[in-house]
Amino acid sequence: MGLPWYRVHTVVLNDPGRLIAVHLMHTALVSGWAGSMALYELAVFDPSDPVLDPMWRQGMFVIPFMTRLGITKSWGGWSITGETVTNAGIWSYEGVAAVHIVLSGLLFLAAIWHWVYWDLELFRDERTGKPSLDLPKIFGIHLFLSGVLCFAFGAFHVTGLFGPGIWISDPYGLTGKVQPVAPAWGAEGFDPFVPGGIASHHIAAGILGILAGLFHLSVRPPQRLYKGLRMGNVETVLSSSIAAVFFAAFVVAGTMWYGSAATPIELFGPTRYQWDQGFFQQEIDRRIRSSKAENLSLSEAWSKIPEKLAFYDYIGNNPAKGGLFRAGAMDNGDGIAVGWLGHAVFKDKEGNELFVRRMPTFFETFPVVLVDEQGIVRADVPFRRAESKYSVEQVGVTVEFYGGELDGVSFSDPATVKKYARRAQLGEIFEFDRATLKSDGVFRSSPRGWFTFGHATFALLFFFGHIWHGARTLFRDVFAGIDPDLDAQVEFGAFQKLGDPTTKRQVI
């Protein structure tokens, strides 16, 4: 049977045994990819600096998902938080990868078995002897089983009752660790940044799924609904399954891009909105004011700022700074962060403190402008020196560093001051190693950006797939060219076509 590439799936349309076989093979490929990708990432991952070179800077994609579910140790003797590990146990990163690869092999064998032994009695209607599936019953079974799994995940894994819990951190991504989570049953459970909502929603959705599954197993659909929604046609299953998948893809694209308790910044990197709103800058400022209230010097106050917090407040970690065709990890862009130089404080010759205006997310270049506390422009790096009034040289701008590697060092040389003013546009100033990875200096996106782009794109494609297959199954008689006023009911069977004399006819 010569089929074009876009029609090949018709071979399993009326063949339940081989329909199972191809789904088993698909699951084998997914599981095998997950395990293989995990092993590849573990081979290239450098766990030595979880503060300045975390997994998301290195472009890791599956390691963050394992970590948020409670995996933190490696058979290589390291932990994601930086400690040395002596006994990682079976549920290490490598252990999870191996389990996926073994599962992939077993699914591969199962797929072959079902392809060979496709004609099972299980799939034949006792009355007609023809291949058939009780799709509403199968729907009930799947709904029940997925409900059990969903409930078990929320009630046992997330709560720590039988499992590790999940990755929990503070809003600024400083104190993350795996710990059990109590379900949040109040209104706070609907806050996407409250981890307790993950437990309570899985428990509630699981119970709903179990009840709905039992309902569909015990109650048959009315005949008009069965016919109206084409419940006897396997393409209806395909259409509604695609709908479930694209809906889920749109949801997770949103929770990833805008941030949520399920996508911690320690594992996936900060969101673009944290840069846009000065989220980390405000927290740093609050801590500095708090330290000054305790009569600490500026140097002491800035030295108390965690390097991790300062690193978040750097535009190169903004996932929206990457470009669509800039492949690779963040480290391949601006380089591997080596150390924080400290906070640069600029002053004019009168001693007034000046603040460098930060670059907005969607700018590649931005004028260097220094403003005072009232937001009035006091200095800049002019485009045309002939017309300049506020140049660094004219205003006499100096820079002094507090905290970090250059703590207490000041510069008055205009060229050096301008260099640090340009770098201060990008947030806190860090030293980068661009030689090791031959980094090109062009910003890359984090896994947060890639995940969002991928899932939003595929969700859109799958949306069209849902419309396509839904229309095909709902309007199958129209597409087949059958007159709706025909007085004989035409039953569709295997390889049936219009005008086939063997078609069963039943007078209405």
UniProtKB/Swiss-Prot annotation:
Transmembrane stretches, start-end: 21-36, 101-115, 140-156, 203-218, 237-252, 457-472
GO cellular component: chloroplast thylakoid membrane; photosystem II
InterPro entries from the UniProt entry: PS_antenna-like, PS_II_antenna-like_sf, PSII_PsbB
Superkingdom of origin: Eukaryota
GO molecular function: chlorophyll binding; electron transporter, transferring electrons within the cyclic electron transport pathway of photosynthesis activity
Keywords in alphabetical order: Chlorophyll, Chloroplast, Chromophore, Membrane, Photosynthesis, Photosystem II, Plastid, Thylakoid, Transmembrane, Transmembrane helix
Pfam families, sorted: PSII
Subcellular compartments: Plastid, Chloroplast thylakoid membrane
One of the GO biological process terms: photosynthetic electron transport in photosystem II
Membrane topology: Multi-pass membrane protein
Cofactor mode of binding and number, as noted: Binds multiple chlorophylls. PSII binds additional chlorophylls, carotenoids and specific lipids.
Alphabetized NCBIfam families for the sequence: PS_II_CP47 (TIGR03039)
Subunit organization: PSII is composed of 1 copy each of membrane proteins PsbA, PsbB, PsbC, PsbD, PsbE, PsbF, PsbH, PsbI, PsbJ, PsbK, PsbL, PsbM, PsbT, PsbX, PsbY, PsbZ, Psb30/Ycf12, at least 3 peripheral proteins of the oxygen-evolving complex and a large number of cofactors. It forms dimeric complexes.
Family: Belongs to the PsbB/PsbC family. PsbB subfamily.
Function (record text): One of the components of the core complex of photosystem II (PSII). It binds chlorophyll and helps catalyze the primary light-induced photochemical processes of PSII. PSII is a light-driven water:plastoquinone oxidoreductase, using light energy to abstract electrons from H(2)O, generating O(2) and a proton gradient subsequently used for ATP formation.
Protein's recorded name: Photosystem II CP47 reaction center protein
Species of provenance: Marchantia polymorpha
